[in-house]
From Swiss-Prot:
Organism: Thermoplasma volcanium (strain ATCC 51530 / DSM 4299 / JCM 9571 / NBRC 15438 / GSS1)
Cross-referenced HAMAP family: CbiD (MF_00787)
Gene Ontology biological process terms, A to Z: anaerobic cobalamin biosynthetic process; methylation
Name this protein carries in UniProt: Cobalt-precorrin-5B C(1)-methyltransferase
Source organism superkingdom: Archaea
The keyword S-adenosyl-L-methionine belongs to this UniProt entry's keyword annotation: yes
GO molecular function: cobalt-precorrin-5B C1-methyltransferase activity
SUPFAM superfamilies tied to this protein: CbiD-like (SSF111342)
Catalytic activity line of the entry: Co-precorrin-5B + S-adenosyl-L-methionine = Co-precorrin-6A + S-adenosyl-L-homocysteine
Stored NCBIfam families: cbiD (TIGR00312)
Residue intervals passing through the bilayer: none
Pathway(s) per entry: Cofactor biosynthesis; adenosylcobalamin biosynthesis; cob(II)yrinate a,c-diamide from sirohydrochlorin (anaerobic route): step 6/10
Pfam families (alphabetical): CbiD
Length: 378
């Protein structure tokens, strides 16, 4: 899957993939069309960023006039991904037609989809690991095909429990299968070495329109950063795991100010001096959070619970119970800023904004005049 360069920073020489969420959306749309119109070979699926993607349907079966199933295969492009090539299947039942033409879409997870058992993942414990972003993609795709009919969907992954063992799911608190995720639907090859060269190009291009650059480790951060900062679109850059490379490129391009904006899972690592935040490179999240929380006098028992947490969100919920979450995360943000100044440049301003999954700012360190372009509450 290739995209031509259109000035948006898409690299035409790398293959972009699709997320598990978009793969599930393709299977769900194909299933709905199979029941209503017959066997499908390909479907075109909308994404939250306005791009429509054609996905091959690997299985399309109509059981009867109201039910059937279809499958699509995940493609990860040049991104190193253990789930590349897995099949996501959707069984569906088409029920009554709404008079107002607005289909009601019901989504459930079945075999091969993990169950969330820990706090802090943006999905309530006990629920299937299908993110809100993925659910929205599935609903939008099916609504295009449903023609006003209500549709009941059941998403499954053959051998999903085995595939999940290749991922970080159990470490973060998801058991029994994979997670169906995706903010944009597109999987960018941000963990490859080639992406560092791509970053230099994007960062340099942004300097033509802004003296301030906002570096975002993930698509969720990128989406919310644009709501908080009154800056040109090219001032926002998706950096993946390559924090050090992105900061170095920003300094080489002579930016006056660098903003690190993201979820705590990635940013806490930077506070520990980790500039490649890929899970296989280094961690230190719990140790960093526990150490900073201990500075504010929490009990040994609370420190122990933080150290035993499966994910950053769970650790932060413990800190929140202690009533010091703002102090801890503001300290983390300040520590990141100080580290970047010491390790990269003291002549460049460094600000840090930490958000939760809903985009709320939960920690920050704002350096210099950055407040002038930060739109609080908008």
């Amino acid at each position: 899957m290739m995209y031509a360069s259109d000035g948006s920073g898409v690299n035409p020489f790398q293959q972009y993939g699709i997320t598990t969420g978009l793969t599930a959306a393709a299977a769900a749309k194909a299933c709905t069309l199979t029941v209503l119109k017959g066997v499908q070979n390909r479907v075109v699926v909308p994404t939250p960023i306005g791009i429509r993607i054609e996905v091959k349907v690997v299985e399309s079966v109509r059981i009867d006039e109201s039910s059937g199933y279809a499958s699509a295969e995940k493609f990860s492009g040049d991104n190193p991904d253990q789930l590349n090539g897995i099949t996501i299947r959707c069984h569906c039942k088409v029920v009554k037609k709404q008079e107002n033409g607005r289909s009601k879409i019901t989504i459930s997870g079945n075999a091969g989809i993990g169950v969330v058992e820990k706090d802090g993942l943006g999905i309530r414990p006990g629920e299937k690991a299908i993110s809100q972003g993925a659910r929205k993609m599935i609903e939008d795709a099916v609504r295009e095909a449903a023609g006003g009919y209500d549709v009941e969907l059941s998403i499954s992954v053959p051998n999903g429990e085995e595939f999940a063992k290749l991922t970080m799911n159990e470490k973060v608190g998801v058991f029994g299968g994979i997670s169906v995720l995706g903010t944009t639907g597109i999987e960018e090859p941000v963990s490859t070495e080639e992406y560092e060269l791509h970053l230099k190009y994007i960062v340099a291009a942004g300097r033509c329109v802004s003296k301030i650059i906002v570096l975002c480790p993930g698509n969720t951060a990128l989406k919310f950063a644009k709501k908080y900062f009154a800056l040109p679109d090219k001032a926002f850059v998706l950096i993946g795991d390559k924090v050090g490379a992105a900061v170095s490129a920003s300094i080489e391009s002579a930016y006056d100010h660098v903003v690190i904006f993201g979820l705590p899972g990635k940013l806490v690592k930077i506070a520990a001096g980790i500039y490649n935040t890929h899970s296989k490179v280094a961690d230190g999240r719990m140790e960093t959070l526990a150490a900073v929380a201990a500075m504010y006098g929490i009990s040994k028992g609370a420190v122990k619970r933080i150290m035993e947490s499966s994910n950053t969100g769970e650790a932060i919920s413990i800190i929140e119970q202690e009533g010091i979450v703002a102090e801890v995360l503001n300290t983390i943000a300040s520590r990141i800023s100080n580290r970047l100044k010491a390790d990269f440049s003291r002549s460049v301003g460094f600000s840090v904004v930490i958000i939760d999954h809903d985009g709320k700012i939960i920690g920050s360190h704002l350096d210099g005049h950055i407040k002038e372009v930060l739109k609080y509450g908008k």
